[in-house]
């Protein structure tokens, strides 16, 4: 069964209390999680100043420094496929796109909604394209599709050749559109990248030049924000509960990615105001047999089989919490897209039990209230009964508190989790990469200006997930949930290896493994991926662990 949160005796220590001794000189960890950028979307043309080896579009010959197609551009070609009977994670290929369709606007700020984006050519070469050849670096772009079953299809067994086709045939889900004829307004959004060699993302480049960059870090769950933030908090996933036991969600909230009759890959039930649960232990459930078959064919054992509890309906996309940010219960029901309160153990409870201080600082909080800058699915601890039903909810604080705590390091917790306000998160359509850089520059600058704090701190800079952007990196499938696409991670610290690119395979649960190693904690639950071993290097491929499944603990980013 899913492990319920156990009674914890010393759960409520003050957020600024002295932490027990650490195993490294790092006494403060600040984890900053923006949104929705793949590694190649950001670092496509980055060349390490140190001369380190790096896997990106430039090093692979996919593009040139000027962003134009490189000698091996054709190996990224996007293909056309067919799924007319039941969902497949490796659909039957019909052919190859000649040219890619014009990207759509989706809901980008300041642009007409859900139309072709006239700033881009009507047709694009079949492969990655430089966004800033067509628009300014600070301009918003449309939002690529990034959902669970869609990403499994897009990855296509590691070939990564169905990103555009899935975006065009299923999009964000059938409940978000009336019928296939209404279109998805995605086009080739997923294939866009920024060009560091031409001056894009200057602050990310500065951080990578001076600190430690991972080029093998991944989102832990296929798909979008909500499930990936839950993996950061729990090392696993959350499921539907009723009256203290696993239950069955309303029928209209269960995902069904099987195609509707007479359509090609138009999901039967899918969408943000619709299907988001999957009973992933049961191969008779829609979409699950294909994932189980893929796991069974892996050349190594997956973690805990599917790592799905029998009878559990897991939340694999975005729903809001069964609690309001104040701690009050929220209304639930078939047309209220919230998951009931959760008993899944979190890193916050484990830290409190150990007597280690922590806080979560979500952008858009305003005391106990919230503003339009608040992202409810980016705030995973408000889903937890153990947090929201007691004094630990007081550790969820706004960003005025964050900057006050940085200035007065006596109040700075040992472990801090930070999510930017929506407009500074980097999320396509609602923010920009440049706005996320501004937030990071301000935050890291504040930490560095407090010398006593900076000398014993590490700041991990990452994003929740890839946002549906294409990426050339290898993906290690661990269980039915993922991993998913490669994403950026930079360790900013006096102890970081300077200008080094680390190839150790990691995902967001590696952040938990680092915390557990540094503050002497045990794995969170029977199914949490923090049980996985540290990778053993394969001499023939630095990016693929020889002892799969395995994920690192981020210690290789530092020198102590």
Functional labels for PLM-detected ranges:
Residues 1-10:
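Bacterial N-terminal signal peptides
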């Amino acid at each position: 069964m899913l492990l319920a949160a156990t009674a914890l005796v010393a759960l409520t220590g003050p957020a600024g209390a002295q932490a027990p001794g650490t195993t490294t000189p790092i006494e403060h960890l600040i984890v900053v999680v923006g949104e929705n950028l793949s590694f190649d979307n950001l670092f496509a043309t980055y060349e390490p100043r140190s001369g380190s080896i790096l896997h990106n579009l430039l090093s692979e010959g996919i593009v040139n420094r000027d962003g134009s197609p490189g000698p091996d551009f054709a190996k990224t070609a996007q293909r056309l496929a067919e799924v007319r009977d039941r969902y497949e994670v490796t659909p039957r290929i019909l052919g190859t796109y000649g040219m890619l369709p014009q990207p759509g606007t989706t809901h980008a700020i300041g642009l007409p909604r859900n139309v072709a984006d006239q700033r881009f050519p009507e047709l694009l070469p079949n492969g990655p394209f430089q966004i800033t050849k067509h628009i300014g670096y600070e301009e918003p772009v449309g939002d690529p599709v990034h959902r669970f079953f869609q990403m499994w299809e897009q990855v296509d067994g590691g070939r990564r050749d169905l990103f555009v086709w899935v975006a065009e045939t299923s999009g964000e889900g059938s409940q978000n559109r009336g019928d296939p004829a209404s279109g998805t307004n995605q086009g080739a959004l997923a294939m866009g990248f920024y060009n560091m060699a031409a001056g894009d993302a200057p602050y990310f480049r500065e951080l990578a030049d001076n600190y430690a960059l991972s080029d093998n870090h991944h989102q832990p769950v296929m798909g979008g924000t909500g499930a990936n933030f839950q993996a950061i908090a729990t090392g696993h996933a959350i499921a539907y509960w009723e009256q203290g036991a696993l239950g069955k969600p309303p029928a209209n909230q269960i995902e069904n990615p099987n195609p509707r009759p007479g359509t090609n890959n138009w999901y039967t039930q899918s969408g943000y105001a619709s299907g988001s649960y999957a009973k992933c232990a049961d191969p008779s459930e829609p979409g699950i047999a294909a994932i189980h078959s893929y796991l069974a064919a892996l050349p190594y054992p997956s973690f805990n089989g599917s790592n799905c509890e029998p009878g559990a309906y897991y939340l694999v996309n975005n729903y809001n919490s069964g609690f309001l940010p104040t701690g009050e219960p929220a209304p639930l029901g078939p047309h209220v897209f919230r998951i009931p309160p959760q008993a899944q153990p979190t890193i916050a409870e484990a830290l409190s039990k150990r007597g280690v201080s922590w806080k979560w600082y979500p952008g858009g909080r305003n005391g106990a209230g919230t503003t339009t800058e608040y992202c409810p699915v980016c705030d995973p601890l408000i889903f937890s009964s153990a947090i929201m039903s007691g004094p630990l909810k007081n550790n969820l604080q706004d960003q005025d508190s964050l900057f006050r705590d940085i200035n007065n390091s006596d109040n700075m917790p040992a472990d801090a989790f930070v999510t930017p306000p929506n407009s500074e998160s980097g999320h396509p359509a609602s923010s920009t990469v440049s706005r996320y850089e501004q937030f990071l520059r301000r935050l890291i600058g504040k930490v560095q200006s407090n010398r006593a704090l900076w000398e014993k701190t590490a700041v991990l800079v990452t994003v929740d997930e890839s946002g549906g952007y294409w990426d050339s990196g290898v993906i290690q499938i661990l269980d039915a949930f993922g991993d998913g696409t490669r994403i950026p991670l930079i360790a900013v610290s006096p102890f970081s290896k300077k200008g080094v690119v680390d190839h150790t395979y990691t995902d967001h649960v590696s952040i938990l493994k680092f915390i557990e190693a540094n503050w002497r904690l045990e794995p969170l639950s029977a199914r949490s991926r923090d049980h996985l071993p540290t990778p053993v290097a394969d001499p023939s491929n630095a990016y693929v662990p020889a002892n799969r499944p395995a994920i690192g603990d981020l210690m290789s980013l530092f020198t102590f």
